[in-house]
Amino acid sequence: MNIVILQGAFFPVPPLLGGAVEKMWFKLGQEFAKLGHHVTHISKQYPGFPDEEMIDGVQHRRVTGHTPPKSMLKQKFLDAVYSWRAVKSIPTSTDIVITNSFWSPIFLLVNKHAVVYVDVARMPKGQLKFYSRADCFRANSGAVVAAIKDEIPATEYHRIRMVPNPLPFNALSEINFEIKESIILYCGRVHEEKGLELLARAVNRIDLKGWRIKIVGPWNVSMGGSGEDYKNNLVKCFEKCNVEFTGPIFDESKLNEIYSKATIFVYPSLAEKGETFGLAPLEAMAWGNVPIVSNLTCFKDFIQHDANGLIFDHRSTTPDVNLAESIERLIESASLRENLAIQALKVRETHSTVKIANQFIVDFELLINSRRARLAQENKFKDV
């Protein structure tokens, strides 16, 4: 197959500045290439990156992109400009185009032969009705499937595919639980919708018994955070705790080292309409962290309460008490931590890049064969 991965306007590939979607497709593209497919990955230009290069069997093409603006309206305009350039750089022999860009599925109307595979990486906001050219809406969780169904007629549900996100790394080392440290970790954007103030209230309620809090992620608005003032106020909220804000860490080996040392991973997101999958908890589980997550639907695809993690009710009148009780349970019981962590490690198999890549390839082949058969039938009628 000739596969094109078309990313958005604001993050470079390789994902030096982060971006969960860019990170995922960068790894998946390499797996597709290992399986013998020709892969072209289109992304924004970035200083130090050539306009074209080959990385691990994947042909990378880069077009002029943009820095994320604060204005959502301006963001959509810049994405449109970028997407038009990016679509024009797609090779003519392409069999399938995978894209998470807002405008690309619309501009791909001009390409009548390639399958258009829309990766609905964020909760849709009304745009799906404009994607008449899309052969598939790929959801990464049951929560996203439900959101897609809210935007398209029931007669179009057959276009929905559910394929989970894979782990963005391979060849993980064995976990030695004896050398893990008393660290409660959060990785993600330092944003008000992520429930970090709730986490602060929760840990202030209990005796942490020497456990440390580590928060990894950007707070700058340009990188999806809530800003410097928010971060400074958040530091004050953790008044009774030993807390460290590291800022963003994009180096995979350094991030994995942090995961490997941590014992508990807390992701108390309050984003009812924002979270689609929860890659950070999945990554943490693969390194033997016990996840504690809020009761959002997206997490339930891979976290089962008291089986491989803990889920607390963030919608109750006392969510801080609920979260505090979950943290305290794990601090108090080493056996509970280890039992849950051993089960959490199974995501290394269920969500490996190799396994998920093969799921995608099977899906791609079905869609490509279906489109070819449909085009052949249309051409047959034209000749009559």
Residues covered by each model-derived region:
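N-terminal strand-loop element at the rim of the active site
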Residues: 9-13, 31-73, 221, 295
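Acidic donor-binding loop of glycosyltransferase active sites
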Residues: 260-276, 289
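Nucleotide-activated donor-binding/catalytic signature segment of Leloir-type glycosyltransferases, i.e.
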Residues: 227-253
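Short hydrophobic beta-strand element within catalytic cores of glycosyltransferases
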Residues: 286, 290-293
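A short, well-ordered alpha-helix in the C-terminal region of glycosyltransferases
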Residues: 329, 336-350, 362
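Conserved donor-binding/catalytic core segment of Leloir-type glycosyltransferases
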Residues: 138, 171, 176-194, 200-205, ...
